[in-house]
C-alpha cells in the first residue's frame, strides 16, 4: 500500500507519545502473554517497521519479517539489521509448506482485501502444532469509532482499513482449519482520552473484566 511507503519515516513517532507508549506496551504484553510456543522459527507477517519482529527476536525466536512496503522495510532493516526482512505478498507467501512454528500478524489484516486467502497461506506455512496470533483493531470499540470518523477529515491509514470483531476473527481461523481458538481484547479508552495514571489503572482493570471488548483484539489459534 503506497500510503505506508509515504509515512514510513514517521510511523514510529506515535510510540514516543504518552498514549502511544502505553498502547504499544499494553498490546505487546497481551500478544506475548498468549504465546504458548516459546522458541522456534517464526514469521512476522506485515511486519512494518519491525516492532514485533524485534520483540520475537528478543524472546529467542529465529524470525523473518515480511511486508509489502519497501519503505517500511527500509526502516525495519536499520532498526534490526541482524534480522532477515522480505518484501513480499501475504497472498502468496514465498515459503515452502510447514516451515514455521509461529506466525504473528499485528495490524495487517485491516488492510487486506482477501483475508480468507491469507489465512490459508498462514495455515500452509505453519508446521503441525504451530500457532498463529493475529492482532487487529476491534470493529465494536470506541477507539474504532473515533479513528473511523477522524479518517473522514484527515488522511490516515484507517481510511483504508476494515475492522474485525472477535467473532469474525474466530470464523476466519475456523474456515482455514485452525483449532483451539481464543480471543482477547484490550485498551478501552479512545486515543483522545487523557491517559493519566488513574486512566492507565482503570484501563488495565477493564482489560481483565471485559476480555473481548477492547480496541485491540487478538486471536490465537493452533494448526
Which residues does each predicted region cover?
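A C-terminal cap/extension of S-adenosyl-L-methionine-dependent methyltransferases
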Residues: 147, 171, 180-223
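A short glycine-rich, Lys/Arg-flanked "PGG" loop and its adjoining helix->strand segment in the class I
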Residues: 116-128
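Acceptor-substrate binding/catalytic loop of class I
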Residues: 151-168
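Class I SAM-dependent methyltransferase SAM/SAH-binding core
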Residues: 43, 49-92
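Conserved class I S-adenosyl-L-methionine
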Residues: 1-37, 51, 55, 131-155, 193-196, ...
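Short catalytic micro-motifs in class I SAM-dependent methyltransferases
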Residues: 107-111
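A conserved beta-strand element that flanks and buttresses the S-adenosyl-L-methionine
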Residues: 104
Amino acid at each position: 500500500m503506497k500510503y505506508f511507503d509515504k509515512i514510513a519515516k514517521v510511523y514510529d513517532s506515535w510510540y514516543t507519545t504518552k498514549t502511544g507508549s502505553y498502547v504499544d506496551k499494553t498490546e505487546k504484553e497481551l500478544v506475548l502473554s498468549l504465546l504458548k510456543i516459546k522458541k522456534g522459527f517464526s514469521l512476522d507477517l506485515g511486519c512494518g517497521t519491525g516492532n514485533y519482529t524485534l520483540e520475537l527476536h528478543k524472546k529467542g525466536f529465529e524470525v523473518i519479517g515480511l511486508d509489502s512496503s519497501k519503505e517500511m522495510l527500509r526502516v525495519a532493516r536499520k532498526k534490526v539489521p541482524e534480522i532477515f526482512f522480505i518484501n513480499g505478498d501475504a497472498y502468496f507467501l514465498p515459503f515452502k509448506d510447514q516451515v514455521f512454528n509461529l506466525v504473528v500478524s499485528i495490524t495487517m489484516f485491516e488492510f487486506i482485501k482477501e483475508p480468507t486467502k491469507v489465512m490459508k497461506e498462514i495455515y500452509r506455512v505453519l508446521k503441525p502444532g504451530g500457532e498463529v496470533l493475529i492482532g487487529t483493531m476491534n470493529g465494536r470499540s470506541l477507539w474504532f469509532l473515533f479513528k473511523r470518523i477522524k479518517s473522514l477529515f484527515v488522511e490516515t491509514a484507517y481510511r483504508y482499513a476494515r475492522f474485525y470483531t472477535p467473532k469474525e476473527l474466530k470464523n476466519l481461523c475456523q474456515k482455514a482449519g485452525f483449532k483451539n481458538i481464543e480471543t482477547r481484547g484490550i485498551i478501552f479508552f479512545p486515543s483522545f482520552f487523557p491517559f493519566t495514571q488513574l486512566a492507565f489503572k482503570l484501563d488495565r482493570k477493564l482489560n481483565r473484566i471485559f476480555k473481548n471488548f477492547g480496541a485491540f483484539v487478538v486471536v490465537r489459534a493452533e494448526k
